[in-house]
Amino acid sequence: MPIGVPKVPFRSPGDEDASWVDVINRLYRERLLFLGQEVDSEISNQLIGLMVFLSIEDDTKDLYLFINSPGGWVIPGLGIYDTMQFVQPDVQTICMGLAASMGSFILVGGEITKRLAFPHARVMIHQPASSFYEAQTGEFILEAEELLKLRETITRVYVQRTGKSLWVISEDMERDVFMSATEAQAHGLVDLVAVE
C-alpha cells in the first residue's frame, strides 16, 4: 500500500503552531526546486511558475534547481532556460544522478560559478532530435529547418556558457557524449564538483 507524499511540519513566520505540508511544498518554500523527470510542458510550466513566484516574493535570495533528468522536449526546456536567465535571483543548478540532453542544457543555464555536480553524477550532451518518420514530405522539410535553427540556438548557448569554441561544441553534439562530474567541470558545463 503506497504511503503517499510524506508530510513535514512547517511554521510560517509569526505563527505559533506548525501546519503539516507535503515535503515538496516545504522544499519549495526554501527555494529548492526539482527537475526529476523528463522535460515536458507540464513540469516546465510548474518550474517557470515557481521561479517567477519566488522571484517576486524575494528577488535577493538564490534559487536552487536540482536536476536528475534524462532530457525531454526542446521547447519546454528552452522555456525553463529563458526563465532562469530572466528572473532576478541567481539560479544555482545542481546535477544529481543524470542531466542528459535538455537536462544538461538546463544545468549549464545556471548562474556561472554556481553550477554544481555531485561526484557520481553523469552529464550528457547531444544534438536535438525529431520524429521525422511521422511527417509528410513537406512537413519533413519544414521540421528539418526548424530543427537546424534549434540546434544553432542550443549550440550558441553551450558555447557562450562553457567558454568552449563553436567547433568543440559542434563536434561534441554530433553524438551522445557522456561525462563524469569532473569531465563536465573540465568541459565548462559545471563549475564545481561536490566532495564525497
From Swiss-Prot:
EC main group: hydrolase
Keyword Hydrolase tagged: yes
GO terms under biological process: protein quality control for misfolded or incompletely synthesized proteins
TM stretches of this protein: none
Keywords for this protein: Chloroplast, Hydrolase, Plastid, Protease, Serine protease
CC terms in the record's Gene Ontology section: chloroplast stroma; endopeptidase Clp complex
Catalyzed reactions per annotation: Hydrolysis of proteins to small peptides in the presence of ATP and magnesium. alpha-casein is the usual test substrate. In the absence of ATP, only oligopeptides shorter than five residues are hydrolyzed (such as succinyl-Leu-Tyr-|-NHMec, and Leu-Tyr-Leu-|-Tyr-Trp, in which cleavage of the -Tyr-|-Leu- and -Tyr-|-Trp bonds also occurs)
Predominant location category: plastid
Subcellular localization, as worded in the UniProt entry: Plastid, Chloroplast stroma
Active site feature: S101 (nucleophile), H126
Record function comment: Cleaves peptides in various proteins in a process that requires ATP hydrolysis. Has a chymotrypsin-like activity. Plays a major role in the degradation of misfolded proteins.
PANTHER family per UniProt: ATP-DEPENDENT CLP PROTEASE PROTEOLYTIC SUBUNIT, CHLOROPLASTIC ATP-DEPENDENT CLP PROTEASE PROTEOLYTIC SUBUNIT 1
Subunit structure: Component of the chloroplastic Clp protease core complex.
Family membership noted in the UniProt record: Belongs to the peptidase S14 family.
Name listed for the protein in its UniProt record: ATP-dependent Clp protease proteolytic subunit
Organism: Morus indica (Mulberry)
